[in-house]
Amino acid sequence: MKFTIIIPARYASTRLPRKPLLDILGKPMIQHVWERAKQAGGHRVIIATDHSEIAEVVTRFGGEVCLTSDKHSSGTERLAEVVSKMNISDDEIIVNVQGDEPLIPPCIIKQVAENLDNHQVNMATLAVKLTQRDELFNPNVVKVLSDKNGMALYFSRAAIPFARDNFPDCSDDFVTQNQYLRHIGIYAYRAGFIKQYVQWQPTALEQLESLEQLRALWNGEKIHLDIALETPEVGVDTQEDLERVRLILSNK
């Protein structure tokens, strides 16, 4: 199995300006992500960025970079531009790794690629089991349901499935026992499917939930879902997240 890893790295960030370039123990954050991705077994790792400063930094540490438009409204549109510019074949497996995940386990990057390769689907992703009530009711934590065949039924910021007789006053034990799932934002696709995906218009569901993957379900595509082999640490969205990542890495 051959797969390509693409890491989108946007320069602009509301809460953390120049986020991919923020220092973590002497290296820019995007380099930490790239180094993790290189360990996953893909034959190619490409960093897709909309800014020349990021491109220059990536080139200096030895990474492959694709300079993309700064007009994209979604990460998948950026992937589509990379697939086109780099002449990636339609049957190539593409794994999208977020550029703000400096602690992402390499094993789950390989896992999601293998899952796509082993199933007759165009898209695959991962989840982990929820253990805390607060996470279940946190709209920033995306929940997901799957069917008996491991195909995603729905993604939501709401607490799903809704336990009529137990919500909202349920315990952490209740959450654990009922195997609620938190979605992890890592995806594998066929390159040709990415081109198809960006031709579809945004749907009402994805706009309501602000969850781009719902466009695929709305259009009848199946998304394979599996439990991640390793639970990833938090991504970097805030200054507090950044400090936590610095602390974790300094203790390794």
Curated annotation (Swiss-Prot):
Segments traversing the membrane: none
InterPro entries, per the entry: Cytidylyl_trans, KdsB, Nucleotide-diphossugar_trans
NCBIfam families: kdsB (TIGR00466), PRK05450.1-3 (NF003950), PRK05450.1-5 (NF003952), PRK13368.1 (NF009905)
Native organism: Actinobacillus pleuropneumoniae serotype 5b (strain L20)
Function (record text): Activates KDO (a required 8-carbon sugar) for incorporation into bacterial lipopolysaccharide in Gram-negative bacteria.
EC number: 2.7.7.38
An annotated GO BP: lipopolysaccharide biosynthetic process
The keyword Lipid metabolism appears for this protein: no
Name of the featured protein: 3-deoxy-manno-octulosonate cytidylyltransferase 2
Pathway(s) where this gene product acts: Nucleotide-sugar biosynthesis; CMP-3-deoxy-D-manno-octulosonate biosynthesis; CMP-3-deoxy-D-manno-octulosonate from 3-deoxy-D-manno-octulosonate and CTP: step 1/1; Bacterial outer membrane biogenesis; lipopolysaccharide biosynthesis
A molecular-function term among this protein's GO annotations: 3-deoxy-manno-octulosonate cytidylyltransferase activity
Broad enzyme group: transferase
Alphabetized UniProt keyword annotations: Cytoplasm, Lipopolysaccharide biosynthesis, Nucleotidyltransferase, Transferase
GO cellular component, one term: cytosol
Main location, first listed in the record: cytoplasm
Record's subcellular location: Cytoplasm
Database matches in Pfam families: CTP_transf_3
